[in-house]
Amino acid sequence: MIKVGVVGASGYTGLELVKMLITHPGFELTYLATTQGDTTIEALHPSLEGVVTLEVEKADVNAVADACELVFLALPHKASMGFAKGLIEKGVKVVDLSADYRLELDTYEAHYCEHEDKEHLDESVYALIEYYREELKEAELAAGPGCYPTATLLGILPFIPYIDTSAPLFVDAKSGVSGAGKKLSETTHFVTVNDNIFAYNPLKHRHAPEIAEKIEKVHGAKMNVNFVPHLIPATRGELVSVYATLKEDIDPLEVLRKHYANDRFIRIREKPVDIKSTAGTHFCDIYAAKNGHALFVSSAIDNLLRGASSQALAAANLMCGYDEGMGLPVIPYMP
């Protein structure tokens, strides 16, 4: 058993990691921490009372290194890089769920802040599993993709060779409220969200440059990504619709089937996808259709799992020599 820990256990992605790790056949959960201070897991997540007996400590690099061979950092952006640097230098493998290691330096500093660990940023592997599987097997530091980029890229990347990359790419995305995190805000207040839907940060969201950067990384194509996210009155789930211009005649579903023929956690659907069918799972469901030169691609994921925690666990599996799917959730929350 490989000893692992979670730093940032108080949030929703931390909770999902704990839930998967306590039943994982290859990992032993030996360390839980937050940046706020010592507490108990039931104080953070009452649903885990009687299930997890570990105390939750105040995060400390030396304590993590003593207890763990691999650690998940479920921390806010800008907070992870200080921990990751010290842990890697002590020989601990790191899977980071924040944005701190997922972008090129110029892109990160343009949209977040000055980076304090440029050395390890250059060494990180982007943990979009289907595209960086082999690199992750050798990685010491995996950088979890954003939830919206995960759904968007898994949907559109197979089509980049067939679309006009000089034309704008339009991405319409909708996410459940858990995507905004656990911290209270007016935007996520029940009265604001219930019976409502609204866009936020239209054409200015930080996931747009991530999507554009990774399209260029995989296919060498520079695209103008117009990204508009929306908040919907659902707890979890994410639906992304992408609109592009085809430059040749294709069968969209056949393109998807061939591209993902060996990827067991991608499901190609014959009908438009929905968020409930992937809730509680690591699956990404994808549907596509065309009308002349117009291409429509739609992807559905669980934003907390495939968009964050289960994708991080899949990366950890590969980093530790395990089967990619070990311990990943596959049974949806239905009904």
Curated annotation (Swiss-Prot):
One of its GO terms (biological process) is L-arginine biosynthetic process. Signal peptide: none annotated. It is found in: Cytoplasm. Pathway: Amino-acid biosynthesis; L-arginine biosynthesis; N(2)-acetyl-L-ornithine from L-glutamate: step 3/4. Its EC number is 1.2.1.38. Keywords: Amino-acid biosynthesis, Arginine biosynthesis, Cytoplasm, NADP, Oxidoreductase. SUPFAM superfamilies: Glyceraldehyde-3-phosphate dehydrogenase-like, C-terminal domain, NAD(P)-binding Rossmann-fold domains. The keyword Oxidoreductase applies. GO terms for molecular function: N-acetyl-gamma-glutamyl-phosphate reductase activity; NAD binding; NADP+ binding. The active site is at C147. Belongs to the NAGSA dehydrogenase family. Type 1 subfamily. PANTHER family: N-ACETYL-GAMMA-GLUTAMYL-PHOSPHATE REDUCTASE, CHLOROPLASTIC-RELATED, N-ACETYL-GAMMA-GLUTAMYL-PHOSPHATE REDUCTASE, CHLOROPLASTIC-RELATED-RELATED. This is N-acetyl-gamma-glutamyl-phosphate reductase. It comes from Sulfurovum sp. (strain NBC37-1).
